[in-house]
Curated annotation (Swiss-Prot):
Molecular-function annotations in GO: ATP binding; guanine phosphoribosyltransferase activity; hypoxanthine phosphoribosyltransferase activity; metal ion binding; tRNA(Ile)-lysidine synthase activity
Entry's free-text remark on domains: The N-terminal region contains the highly conserved SGGXDS motif, predicted to be a P-loop motif involved in ATP binding.
UniProt remark on cofactor binding: Binds 2 magnesium ions per subunit. One of the ions does not make direct protein contacts.
HAMAP family assigned to the protein according to its UniProt record, in alphabetical order: tRNA_Ile_lys_synt
Chain's gene name: tilS/hprT
Highest taxon above the source species: Bacteria
Role of this protein: Ligates lysine onto the cytidine present at position 34 of the AUA codon-specific tRNA(Ile) that contains the anticodon CAU, in an ATP-dependent manner. Cytidine is converted to lysidine, thus changing the amino acid specificity of the tRNA from methionine to isoleucine.
Annotated protein name in UniProt: Bifunctional protein TilS/HprT
Length: 648
């Protein structure tokens, strides 16, 4: 074994690239690099010979493509190596995909490799990238302005669908590979396109690499060390960025939202790494769409004093900042649709967002207009009412203020995102007086109920269905879905140890504890029985009433049993205190309490849980079983509800 082979073996061991039970698919083009790699693996005894197979994709781009294919076939036939070949017209495929030749070739290659790996149950794809490729890649990315994570260059291994791609030749040079191929008399083809100065990589190879090697013969080892050190740094930073995104990211159908209130206070390097990670997620790990300029544009949006801004990113990705939220969504920009409706008495209109507006004569039983209604004195306005978009110069006469105020300033005060303002209905009377912008502001024409006057009432009904409006009611994600499941696994292990062999009666407190109980008991690995109680002191409010009611009692007897009570949250503690005392009174052998959330600031009785998932601040939290007026239980995370939602 010569020095070159020793360094490859050492590199494989250092990065744990190949294990004895791996099955290898070697990508072989017919050139010296990949044939040398195949020869090395075939003679290395790293894996049994029957664990090695070959894949070759004929791109049909060059005259000698058929010769290269024949070289691969001949080598494999002589050695008895299984090989898989596919021929693809890359030019035609590029036209149909509307992508460049190089990008299309890469996509098709990896699709082919992954297909073979899946069909043949192969877990490692072996590629022949070497030290020259590494230097070229790092320099190209630096000059092109790639995001900083690209500076680390080609990695020894990366995840693929159903396996890994590995690169054991990264520590050795092109010259060493040629020497190896000639030493072992390998017949290979030379890709004539590698000498063409039309390609960027070839210009770096021909003009920069010779200069660098002349300046410092140790340039290869220096770039190898640079790649490994920067990779380690980026991996550490990426772990922090991943945690940051888990706490501040909401995925809602086609839209992904980054919550900015705490995110923008993080250190700039962490923000940049988190944005890069987010873009990789959005672009499905295709880094070709991401440059450092895109990341800096987004960071500028986040740190700007302008609360409403928008930028277009590659592949029709749009980033919209709306005050403390940054929304990402693929698609075309929608031109604001203009609308204009006339509203006569007893008419009802429906807007594009499925909200509806209705005008009626005030009933004698109507005592209040509420937040979603407005009372008007008939003598002060002229019918029909007009429902339209805003227009430049709109002004509203304000209650308790002299003069009028620009609608634009009212929107800014209310923190209405710029891209949403043209969608809001502006209600005027027939003479043009602005009466109301539903959900934003009422004018000075808003009146109290009067039995003596003829009055109209406008009713605005929002479309509150659908997942989007539910997520938009959340001020901040407090505990992410991943954090919940990690804590539940931890609690499950503790409860398994506690109750092994005791067959406890597990009591779920309806309704809020149901999701928590369902996930938790999957993690408790011992026999148990389940029952439920529905005990409440809240109703549809946000503060405990102090009165505890049993809505559903247990079916099973607790006498002589070990009882574990599962609750979603301990707030005032009044409900749980009553329940625990009741179970003890019924002669349970033991009573223990596990709660997902504990809110000590709300406590007004003495009670402590035996097992606690998370301690939460004195905020109104919803999600994962917790509700407000029976809403939000199906959120997959724990979030803080916006105050305006429960104060309406």
């Amino acid at each position: 074994m010569d020095d070159t082979e020793k360094r490859v073996h050492k590199y494989i061991e250092k990065h744990d690239l190949i294990r004895s039970d791996d099955k290898l698919l070697v990508a072989v083009s017919g050139g010296p690099d990949s044939l040398a790699l195949l020869h090395f693996l075939w003679n290395s005894n790293l894996v049994p010979k029957e664990a090695i197979s070959v894949a070759h994709l004929n791109h049909q781009l060059r005259e000698n493509a058929a010769k290269e294919q024949r070289v691969v076939e001949t080598f494999c036939e002589r050695q008895g190596i299984p090989f898989y070949i596919e021929e693809v017209d890359i030019k035609s495929r590029a036209q149909s995909l509307q992508k460049g030749l190089e990008e299309t070739a890469r996509i098709v290659r990896y699709d082919f490799f992954e297909k073979v790996m899946a069909e043949k149950n192969i877990n490692k794809l072996v590629l022949a990238h070497h030290a020259d490729d590494q230097i070229e890649t790092i320099l190209m990315r630096l000059v092109r302005g790639s995001a900083s994570i690209g500076w680390s260059g080609i990695q020894p291994k990366r995840e693929l669908k159903g396996g890994q791609a590995i690169r054991p030749f990264l520590p050795i040079t092109k010259a060493e590979i040629i020497d190896y191929a000639q030493k072992h008399e390998l017949a290979y083809e030379i890709d004539e396109s590698n000498t063409s100065q039309e390609y960027t990589r070839n210009r770096y190879r021909a003009q920069l690499l010779p200069f660098l090697k002349q300046e410092n013969p140790a340039v290869y080892s220096h770039f190898e060390r640079f790649s490994e050190e920067t990779s380690e740094d980026f991996q550490f930073l990426e772990a922090l960025a991943s945690d940051l995104l888990k706490k501040n990211l909401i995925k809602n159908g086609k839209q992904t939202t980054l919550l900015l209130s705490s995110f923008k206070n993080e250190a700039n390097p962490l923000q940049r790494r988190a944005i890069h990670l987010l873009l990789r997620y959005l672009y499905n790990e295709d880094a070709s769409f991401i440059t450092v300029n895109h990341i800096y544009q987004i960071i500028q949006m986040i740190q700007s004093d302008n609360p409403s801004s928008s930028i277009d990113l590659p592949n029709k990705l749009i980033a919209n900042r709306a005050y403390d939220k940054l929304h990402f969504q693929f698609g075309e920009r929608e031109a604001p649709s203009e609308f204009y409706h006339q509203l006569e008495l007893n008419d009802r209109i429906e807007l594009d967002n499925k909200a509806s507006i209705r005008l009626k004569l005030k009933s004698s039983v109507v005592q209040t207009n509420g937040l979603n209604g407005m009372l008007l004195d008939a003598e002060e306005i002229t019918l029909p009412l007009i429902v339209r978009n805003r227009v430049n110069g709109d002004r509203m006469t304000m209650k308790g203020q002299a003069g009028s105020k620009k609608l634009k300033d009212i929107f800014i005060d209310a923190k209405i995102p710029r891209q949403e303002r043209d969608k809001l209905p502006v209600i005027t009377d027939y003479t043009g007086k602005i009466l109301w912008v539903p959900g934003v502001k009422k004018s000075a024409y808003d009146r109290e109920f009067s039995r003596s006057k003829k009055q109209y009432i406008i009713r605005y009904t929002r479309n509150i269905g659908g997942n989007e409006s539910m997520h938009n009611d959340i001020q901040k994600v407090l505990i992410s879905e991943d954090e919940l499941q990690e804590k539940i696994r931890e609690l499950g292990r503790e409860l398994t140890t506690e109750y092994e062999g005791r067959n406890p009666l597990v009591v779920g407190v309806l309704k809020g504890a149901t999701p928590f109980m369902t996930d938790l008991l999957k993690r408790v690995d011992t026999y148990l029985e389940m029952d439920f109680m529905d005990v409440s002191s809240y109703g549809n409010g946000t503060v405990s009433s102090g009165e505890v009611k049993i809505i559903k009692d247990l079916n099973a007897s607790v006498e002589g049993r070990d009882v574990l009570v599962i609750e979603d949250i301990i707030d005032s503690g009044r409900t749980l205190s009553y329940l625990v005392d009741l179970i003890k009174y019924r002669k349970a052998k033991s009573v223990k309490l596990v709660t997902l959330l504990d809110k000590p600031a709300g406590r007004n009785v003495e009670i402590e849980a035996d097992y606690v998932g998370f301690v939460v601040p004195n905020e109104f939290v919803v999600g994962y079983g917790l509700d407000y007026a029976e809403r939000y239980r199906n959120l997959p995370y724990i979030g803080i509800l916006k105050p305006e939602i429960y104060s309406e």
